[in-house]
């Protein structure tokens, strides 16, 4: 064999040896997997205490046996010599088939949730006396919903009214004006059930719909309250220290519809058009026990047609890909049953079967709160609490709040560049921070001006009232003094007349008086 042929054979041998090496590795992997099938089955049957040992063994299973790779050294290949095949390198590969531990993440989340508890902010809107408070007490099975008043927007005005008590008709007119305003009150309570704590915040709207002319002023305070809670959360996110953000955003809005049985009023449609993009809207027909089943079905159909024509979107329970048929059917039923015809009562009555149930007793029978044949109370509880409370909070955070945040920042002139390779410009960053800071200052300035103007107007009213009272008092005293002066003059004239009539013949010439001094 010539030297040229030997060099060609040397160049072809590595390719052949690579193919042989791959075949040998495949056979070796199959053998190793068969050898360790029994060990893995023993591990999965309960021997989970050796996780760390097996993990270390798996890491150290990749071994390289001593030998000459490919059987050819560099010096021999340069000389053109061919050596016999040498023992090849053996690779042992293993996969970790043991228990890693991330399946315990739900348990960790459960433990953390039990420790921290949950929070839920619920807005109740409807006319006074429609049963908002009663339904809240029935939903959460707690009669102390209104025990802790956290925030009252009319508190300052009430304090001013107390200072002005007993000061005339001006106070009565002012208090009458205050009674015709929507008052927003926030109540907080901690409810515990089976070791799970819920921080419940119920926001009530007193005076809604009580105006003779229910224009935009009827729902403006409610919209401002929702926006202010979004602004508070946005300001908390922009702070340096964000570990203690208290979420006060409205997670759901229960709108109470009067049980007229006909159609929605213009006020109902206008309010729901203004609020459905800011919170999860859930309409309910209050006091539905005054309607028959046929009237309820007809009323529901009319309401849904009006909402569709007005392009008002209600909260729709999501259906996930891994949901079974029962959960999917429940989600569809919860949405198709809107608006819910509900009743509220925590009174315990006895039904016809002799069982103690929550409900109301009438001369014609007993209506049960938790009976699906009597009301949609259980559907509302499933949607609001039992099944989709976290979905309500998630939609508020990821959709409604993000839409509000984007529009808010866009109004401030802050735009986002979606390019991936974006250079950091400190000047533009500083300009954005300056814009945000100026917006905050402008907001604070507007709030301070509003408060200042309010205080000034209240002080002016007090001064005007005091001035009016002083003028009235001065006038009254002047008239009184004038009457007294006139009475004294009349009395003087009477005395003079009586003196003249008593001594008619007396000489009224002046009597000379004695002079004092030494010249008398």
From Swiss-Prot:
InterPro entries assigned: G_SEPTIN_dom (IPR030379), P-loop_NTPase (IPR027417), Septin (IPR016491)
Residues annotated as binding GTP: 126-133, 207, 287-295, 344, 360
Family (UniProt): Belongs to the TRAFAC class TrmE-Era-EngA-EngB-Septin-like GTPase superfamily. Septin GTPase family.
Pfam assignment, any one: Septin
Residue numbers spanned by region G3 motif: 204-207
Modified residues (Phosphoserine): 2, 9, 60, 77, 175, 509
Annotated stretches, region: G1 motif: 126-133
Modified residues (N-acetylserine): 2
Transmembrane segments: none
PANTHER family attached to this UniProt entry: SEPTIN
Region listing for G4 motif, in residue ranges: 286-289
Biased composition (Acidic residues): 156-167
Residue ranges constituting the Septin-type G domain according to the UniProt record: 116-411
Segments of skewed composition (Basic and acidic residues): 1-24, 51-64, 168-179
Region feature Disordered, mapped onto this chain: 1-83, 156-181, 496-520
Entry-annotated residues carrying Phosphothreonine: 47, 468
Coiled-coil annotated residue ranges, if any: 427-508
Biological role stated in the UniProt entry: Septins are GTPases involved in cytokinesis that assemble early in the cell cycle as a patch at the incipient bud site and form a ring approximate 15 minutes before bud emergence, which transforms into an hour-glass shaped collar of cortical filaments that spans both sides of the mother-bud neck. This collar persists until just before cytokinesis, when it splits into two rings that occupy opposite sides of the neck. The septins at the bud neck serve as a structural scaffold that recruits different components involved in diverse processes at specific stages during the cell cycle.
GO MF annotations in UniProt: GTP binding; GTPase activity; molecular adaptor activity; phosphatidylinositol-4-phosphate binding; phosphatidylinositol-5-phosphate binding; structural constituent of cytoskeleton
UniProt name for this protein: Cell division control protein 3
């Amino acid at each position: 064999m010539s030297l040229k042929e030997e060099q060609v054979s040397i160049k072809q041998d590595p390719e052949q040896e690579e193919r042989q090496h791959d075949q040998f590795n495949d056979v070796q992997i199959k053998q190793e997997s068969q050898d360790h099938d029994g060990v893995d089955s023993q591990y999965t049957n309960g021997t989970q205490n050796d996780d760390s040992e097996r993990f270390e063994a798996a890491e150290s299973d990749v071994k390289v046996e001593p030998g000459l790779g490919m059987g050819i050294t560099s010096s021999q290949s340069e000389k053109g010599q061919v050596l016999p095949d040498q023992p090849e390198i053996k690779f042992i590969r293993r996969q970790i088939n043991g228990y890693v531990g991330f399946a315990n993440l739900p348990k960790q989340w459960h433990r953390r949730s039990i420790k921290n508890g949950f929070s839920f902010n619920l807005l109740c809107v409807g006319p006074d006396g429609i049963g908002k408070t009663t339904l809240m007490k029935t939903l959460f099975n707690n009669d102390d919903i209104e025990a802790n008043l956290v925030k009252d927007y009319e508190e300052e005005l009430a304090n001013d009214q107390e200072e002005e008590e007993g000061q005339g008709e001006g106070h009565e007119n002012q208090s009458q004006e205050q009674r015709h305003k929507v008052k927003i009150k926030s109540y907080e309570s901690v409810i515990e059930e089976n070791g799970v704590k819920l921080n419940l915040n119920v926001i009530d709207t007193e005076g809604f719909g009580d105006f003779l002319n229910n224009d935009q002023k009827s729902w403006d305070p409610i919209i401002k309250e929702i926006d202010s809670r979004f602004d508070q959360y946005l300001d908390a996110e922009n702070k340096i220290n964000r570990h203690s953000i208290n979420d006060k955003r409205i997670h759901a809005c229960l709108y109470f519809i009067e049980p007229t049985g006909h159609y929605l009023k213009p006020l109902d449609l206008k309010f729901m058009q203004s609020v459905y993009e800011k919170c999860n809207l859930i309409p309910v027909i209050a006091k539905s026990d005054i309607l028959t089943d046929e009237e309820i079905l007809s009323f529901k159909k009319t309401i849904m047609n009006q909402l569709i024509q007005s392009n008002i979107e209600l909260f729709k329970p999501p259906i996930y890909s891994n949901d079974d048929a029962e959960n999917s059917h429940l989600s569809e039923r919860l949405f198709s049953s809107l608006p819910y015809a509900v009743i509220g009562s925590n009174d315990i009555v006895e039904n016809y079967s002799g069982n103690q149930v929550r409900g109301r007793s009438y001369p014609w029978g007993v209506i049960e709160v938790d009976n699906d044949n009597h009301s949609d109370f259980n559907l509302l509880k499933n949607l609001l609490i039992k099944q989709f409370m976290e979905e309500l909070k998630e939609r508020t955070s990821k959709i409604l709040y993000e839409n509000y945040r984007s529009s808010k920042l866009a109004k401030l002139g802050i735009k986002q560049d979606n390019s991936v390779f974006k250079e950091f410009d400190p000047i533009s960053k500083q300009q954005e921070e300056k814009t945000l800071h100026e917006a905050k200052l402008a907001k604070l300035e507007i709030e301070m001006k509003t408060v200042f103007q309010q205080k000034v107007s209240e002080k002016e009213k007090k001064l005007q009232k005091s001035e009016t009272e002083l003028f009235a008092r001065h006038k009254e005293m002047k008239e009184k003094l004038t009457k007294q002066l006139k009475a004294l003059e009349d009395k003087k004239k009477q005395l003079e007349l009586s003196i003249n009539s008593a001594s008619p013949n007396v000489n009224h010439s002046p009597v000379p008086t004695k002079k004092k001094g030494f010249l008398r």
